[in-house]
Amino acid sequence: MESHRLTSEDLAALLETVQRFAQRSLADATAAPHQPMPPATTAALVGQLLDMGVLNATEEPACGLWDDPQDPLQVEFALHALQTLAHQSPGFAYQVHVQALANLLSRSTGAPTGPDLVVLEGWLGLGRRALPGTLLGTVSGAATSPEDAARMADCWCLPTADKPRTVVALPDWSTVWIPTWQADKGWCWHRLARTDLVVQMQAHAHGLDELVPQRISLRAGVVPPAADICAADESSLHFLALSGLYGMGLLAIAPGAARRALAIATDYAAMRRQGGPLIQEHDAVAQLLGEARQSVRLADTALASTTQPTTSLALLADIWQLRAALHPLLCTAASQSMQVLGGIGYMRDQGVEKLLRDCNQLRLLGGSPQELTLCSAQKELLV
């Protein structure tokens, strides 16, 4: 595929386009935080990004989100765009992020593009400490231990009624990319049509109210694909690369949500009086706002250092470590922002309560902080 390298002028123009979309169309649709966007509205807004070229669902790479992760300016665009979208709607940003990654994988493997999704978790998380060994073996050729092989084959099996995968997305999609790990083949990718799957809509677990958790499993009698979609030696590299981009995207979306919560709290503290002075002049409020601001700025600094594509386990482990450290801080920042508003901060029409729930939900996607820490620790033992 021919690469489309961005110039700094291209980057500025694309970011301006996303900013304008977020401040107008997306802001209008999310003006009432206690009333999540209906799926039809969310899908229509995704369609606008497709029309603008911000999201690319064609079979040729262009300048859309995650079109060329080898281009540092394209990575910078993706991260800034996701932050901008998340400032208005973290759930919308997450949908766009996952859809862009699925389109990237489709283009990379020569598969048709479309309203695809990609799942980058097993049926029970990441496989804990077994995951790094399988990825290291991809690069070094080292054999996977029998214990790790058994754990990975269980966690990353094809979705069944007993071991389903979970998709958090809009309800209308046609195909989903599923990675599996098989003892005799290692990493494999399967592009499964919705018609071959049982899709069960679930109740909202916590945050990202714009999207629907969906439990997916193969229909009875459906024979899994006999051949891998992409060559065996490429499958694990695709998993390594997409896992890194997925984590980088979450590291962009969560600060966008926390920054919005902080902005609401800062504005409130600058107008609310208690005992005479504005509450921003009270030490307790200043402490809450200061700590929340530190967490958001720390996340910004960390994100600026993650523009390199994940071509090795070491680089992916860096993202695991950043996520494990930063997601709890960003959740705390959103919580501190909510506390500044006092009792009304818990009211859903204020918006901060939803942003806190969104941050909490983002913390658990793609591995909890505890599991990411375990994976990082295991990587250190292997190299």
Model-derived features: positions:
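Glycine-rich phosphate/cofactor-binding loops in nucleotide/flavin-utilizing enzymes
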Residues: 3-4, 341-383
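Glycine-rich beta->alpha junctions and the first turn(s) of the following alpha-helix
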Residues: 5-7, 14, 203-296
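C-terminal helix-coil-helix/basic helical segment that borders enzyme active sites and/or dimer interfaces
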Residues: 27-37, 62, 296-327, 338-346, ...
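Charge-rich, acidic-biased intrinsically disordered regions
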Residues: 36-47, 280-286, 313-326, 345-361
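Glycine-rich flavin
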Residues: 36-191, 195, 375
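Short amphipathic alpha-helical face segments that pack within enzyme cores
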Residues: 76, 80, 100-104, 253-260, ...
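Amphipathic alpha-helices that form helix-helix packing interfaces
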Residues: 251, 258-261, 265, 292, ...
